[in-house]
From Swiss-Prot:
Keyword Lipid metabolism assigned: yes
GO-annotated biological processes: monoacylglycerol catabolic process; phosphatidylserine catabolic process; prostaglandin catabolic process
Domain AB hydrolase-1: 281-407
Chief subcellular location: membrane
Protein localization: Membrane
Family named by the database record: Belongs to the AB hydrolase superfamily. ABHD16 family.
Membrane topology: Multi-pass membrane protein
Active site: residue positions: S355, D430, H507
Protein name per its UniProtKB record: Phosphatidylserine lipase ABHD16A
Topological region Cytoplasmic: 114-558
Organism: Rattus norvegicus
Reaction(s) catalysed by this chain's protein: 1-heptadecanoyl-2-(5Z,8Z,11Z,14Z-eicosatetraenoyl)-sn-glycero-3-phosphoserine + H2O = 1-heptadecanoyl-sn-glycero-3-phosphoserine + (5Z,8Z,11Z,14Z)-eicosatetraenoate + H(+); 1-hexadecanoyl-2-(9Z-octadecenoyl)-sn-glycero-3-phospho-L-serine + H2O = 1-hexadecanoyl-sn-glycero-3-phospho-L-serine + (9Z)-octadecenoate + H(+); 1-octadecanoyl-2-(9Z,12Z-octadecadienoyl)-sn-glycero-3-phosphoserine + H2O = 1-octadecanoyl-sn-glycero-3-phosphoserine + (9Z,12Z)-octadecadienoate + H(+); 1-heptadecanoyl-2-(5Z,8Z,11Z,14Z-eicosatetraenoyl)-sn-glycero-3-phosphocholine + H2O = 1-heptadecanoyl-sn-glycero-3-phosphocholine + (5Z,8Z,11Z,14Z)-eicosatetraenoate + H(+)
Function of the molecule: Phosphatidylserine (PS) lipase that mediates the hydrolysis of phosphatidylserine to generate lysophosphatidylserine (LPS). LPS constitutes a class of signaling lipids that regulates immunological and neurological processes. Has no activity towards diacylglycerol, triacylglycerol or lysophosphatidylserine lipase. Also has monoacylglycerol lipase activity, with preference for 1-(9Z,12Z-octadecadienoyl)-glycerol (1-LG) and 2-glyceryl-15-deoxy-Delta(12,14)-prostaglandin J2 (15d-PGJ(2)-G).
Amino acid sequence: MAKLLSCVLGPRLYKIYRERDTDRAATSVPETPTAVPAASSSSWDSYYQPRALEKHADSILALASVFWSISYYSSPFAFFYLYRKGYLSLSKVVPFSHYAGTLLVLLAGVACLRGIGRWTNPQYRQFITILEATHRNQSAENKRQLANYNFDFRSWPVDFHWEEPSSRKGSRGGPSRRGVALLRPEPLHRGTADTFLNRVKKLPCQITSYLVAHTLGRRMLYPGSVYLLQKALMPVLLQGQARLVEECNGRRAKLLACDGNEIDTMFVDRRGTAEPQGQKLVICCEGNAGFYEVGCVSTPLEAGYSVLGWNHPGFAGSTGVPFPQNEANAMDVVVQFAIHRLGFQPQDIVIYAWSIGGFTATWAAMSYPDISAVILDASFDDLVPLALKVMPDSWRALVTRTVRQHLNLNNAEQLCRFQGPVLLVRRTKDEIITTTVPEDIMSNRGNDLLLKLLQFRYPRVMTEEGLRAVRQWLEASSQLEEASIYSRWEVDEDWCVSVLRSYQAEHGPDFPWSVGEDMSVDGRRQLALFLARKHLHNFEATHCTPLPAQHFQMPWCL
């Protein structure tokens, strides 16, 4: 009976991976009493095949889940309609509650039938035995056997806890359960006394901003967190996971962040290969509808690097909702996992982000200043201009307030706190992070990210003359035009490098630098163009085109 109950309450099993013998001898440990025999080779190399009873019951429950999701998103309109029609009276609600109760009982019966179908399937019984054994004892052998299954990630045991690093226990500087530290926006109205009357006046606007951010705003900003989209993408995500596990020998892990969210990660270790770049770990931060299963992790993988991918809170196997605080909390535990469990030094870690992933990437760069480098692909400086682009002009004040208070993705501000090498990849046909049309390359917010970074690091170089020269270079629509502008100002790269190295040797590496203070106008122009070209590379593509491996380059440094 205990096993039958486990089958009723157990997670859905999606796939049984092919047996992987790579490095088995090196990773295996003596079998413990709680370890379970491995599955026979005949059961591998296919999706899990449920029996007819389980299959049909699963279909009914999945359909009910979709209907519930549709009802949830349409509930405000349905409530308004029922109220107008007078269906919310007690005489109408009581019979409806009876119908709802009957439906719940029927669904519970379907779940029991599904459990019986699982109980009659030897594959599922073996899986649930391994899962229960792993929850009792997370030995290396049990976890190795569990990794051969792809199932509902909610039942996966936690592999790494945010408090696990010994340096954080009792530390005042580390994150608390309230979350890691974020840069807070300045008050919208400076100098205004924060009296009780002013607070009361602001309350309606604050309530409106909160409701907009937690309903429409969050789902527009992170559509990948919408359940219906995840349901539609499920077959693609399962195929992507199978590729990472079976072909790349990826290892999945669940991390517990300081806010209680569980973060779904995938690690591909290339340190045992002959390629030197395998010693570097690239942590990938996906876009607003990206998942590590099918996202930007493929670029550094093809380039031969070790890779750690993770899903935003609320995406696929990760729990929670993707607000900035939760995003930063998730990124923090991912970096801690890379350092303290995977064994990478911060100097061997590169943060690579695509699009909206630039927020967590720049937060990690700001919070972990010893990391090797940051690569931002198709990212932006600040969310407000992009949010104003897609909303009506009459909503400008509401949109600005909502973003600043609840969805403040201040990438440029965070990036300027990082002292290490940075590379920006600008898509020349980007249709997402341009504020006008894709053809208007000067409206690409990647330009503003570059200018803010250079103005912070080299303020004496990025004066009016240097800024004008860089803007002309950014306006170039082709490589030929770029080279023409570069040669017009007769940029001497050897001279630029010697000037920068001399300054660094005398004053140290910390930014901002005062280099260019006593330099001629032509010298500042040359240096500004040289620095812009070293910090930004163009890629002739739209926003969602995967970055080819040959375009994945480490940032320039002296």
